[in-house]
Amino acid sequence: MTETKKSEELTFEEAMKGLEGIVAKLEEGDVPLEQAINYFQEGMALSKMCHEKLQHVEKQMDFILKDNGELAPFSVQEEDEGDK
């Protein structure tokens, strides 16, 4: 990564900001091929890190407080992704 922090040390918000910056650079279209590949690899690493952080949060939210204060399982219904 070009930043001083390693990807493991980035917060979710920092990683998303980095990913948005990479997307903006690639969308400009004036990036040499080799640099575009480097940006793409960095973006994929940031995307993976964000996904892993979200999965970790989902596991933490596996139990939420019910109205009476007891813990209850929490499940997220995923949207239909359609054809990939």
Curated annotation (Swiss-Prot):
It is found in: Cytoplasm. It catalyses: Exonucleolytic cleavage in either 5'- to 3'- or 3'- to 5'-direction to yield nucleoside 5'-phosphates. The keyword Cytoplasm applies. GO terms for cellular component: cytosol; exodeoxyribonuclease VII complex. One of its GO terms (biological process) is DNA catabolic process. Keywords: Cytoplasm, Exonuclease, Hydrolase, Nuclease. Its main location: cytoplasm. Its EC number is 3.1.11.6. GO terms for molecular function: exodeoxyribonuclease VII activity. Pfam families: Exonuc_VII_S (PF02609). Bidirectionally degrades single-stranded DNA into large acid-insoluble oligonucleotides, which are then degraded further into small acid-soluble oligonucleotides. Belongs to the XseB family. NCBIfam families: PRK14063.1, xseB. Heterooligomer composed of large and small subunits. This is Exodeoxyribonuclease 7 small subunit. It comes from Bacillus velezensis (strain DSM 23117 / BGSC 10A6 / LMG 26770 / FZB42). The lineage of its organism: Bacteria, Bacillati, Bacillota, Bacilli, Bacillales.
